[in-house]
């Protein structure tokens, strides 16, 4: 079956080349988990890396939802992508195993370049995972990437406008998801085993700030099997590291101007970055300010 094409060839451990790839300090390092509603969730975890060919480790220095999600549902995933040309990508499925509040790994993380001179915060907990399956280290064609961005833009112009729908992206979300060259990554749950799959999707762009659309030509075998009406998450960021996560329903593929486009209905927008990670859209109700107190 087509669902198994790309995962059947994954290995049960990573190669030495892939292990070294995860040690690069400046790169995209994403963690894919499943939230309390059963939706995929994406978080940037800069400290994540392979400890051995079969184990991964990363450090926690802030409290966030993904740390709870990974403990509630041990099935999760990683994507490691270099930011220098040519882009190289590694995808991993893993099972969470345990945490440690004291370990050599924590000491190494806290004396690394990222935290060595920090006087306000340090990693206080290490998370460990066993590798279940891993892709080979693969190059991403910049030519194909740019072609997909072009196709998404052309196809988007053929989608019928609906000005009555409420915009769901704030000013930062509009910047992130309007500019096609901003890095974006989509996550969905593998229909075979429910592990999150993380796929680069730079070509995902906003349509009237209510939907995201993308051409599936690049990584077609991974994007084309996203189940219609399933929940997906899209992590987007600018080159200044302003980041948001969009979640919603994948409506399926439609042809516009002769171009096949995947369409995502935006239902939630999440800020995953400090100092205030949390839900942006839909907005939470704000209680009125209390200015008078009446004693009974």
How does the language model describe each region?
Residues 1-296:
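Binding-site signature for planar aromatic cofactors or substrates
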